[in-house]
């Protein structure tokens, strides 16, 4: 019953608002002459949301586990969802850490049991939201910003669908420039 009620409200405009509300804010501040903190308007301030395109760097770049229809060569990804700890390293890199992201993804309902690769991340049920099923005017959109949250293997390989999309979340990320 809960599933049916929630799914009835999945509209693309609501989902877009939810996705923009997730992420992290980067804001530069300074202490003013009066002792109050103030935001600096210097072009560095921004939101990093579920839609933000990012470059994959380091040893994971190009990994077959990160291949998706969005990035067949596994060099780019999109978004960050729930960030808990963040802060600066001694060398000045701003780090964000992502948690509690698994409930945003839904496995292929026709596969039982859920593949080990998804189950180990708790991407194993139909709990959470239904971003993958966003509808515009009652029609499921083809916008892969939404469908990427359904991890079904619908293509000939991972470069044609989003079966690997969960692997693009849950990372410790560096934000540049700060």
List where the protein language model places each region.
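Conserved small-residue
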Residues: 1-178
């Amino acid at each position: 019953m809960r599933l049916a009620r929630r799914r009835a409200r999945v509209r693309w405009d609501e989902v877009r608002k939810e996705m923009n509300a997730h992420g992290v804010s980067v804001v530069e501040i300074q202490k003013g002459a009066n002792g109050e903190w103030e935001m600096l308007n210097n072009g560095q301030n921004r939101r990093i949301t579920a839609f933000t395109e990012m470059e994959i760097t380091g040893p994971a770049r190009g990994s077959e586990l990160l291949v998706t229809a969005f990035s067949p060569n596994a060099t780019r990804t999109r978004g960050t969802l729930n960030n808990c700890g963040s802060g600066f390293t001694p060398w000045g890199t701003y780090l964000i850490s992502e948690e509690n992201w698994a409930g945003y993804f839904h496995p292929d309902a026709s596969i039982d049991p859920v593949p080990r690769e998804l189950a180990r991340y708790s991407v194993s049920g139909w709990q959470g939201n239904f971003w993958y099923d966003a509808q515009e005017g009652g029609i499921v959109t083809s916008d892969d910003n939404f469908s990427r949250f359904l991890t079904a293997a619908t293509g000939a390989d991972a470069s044609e669908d989003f079966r690997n999309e969960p692997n693009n979340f849950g990372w410790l990320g560096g934000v540049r420039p700060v």
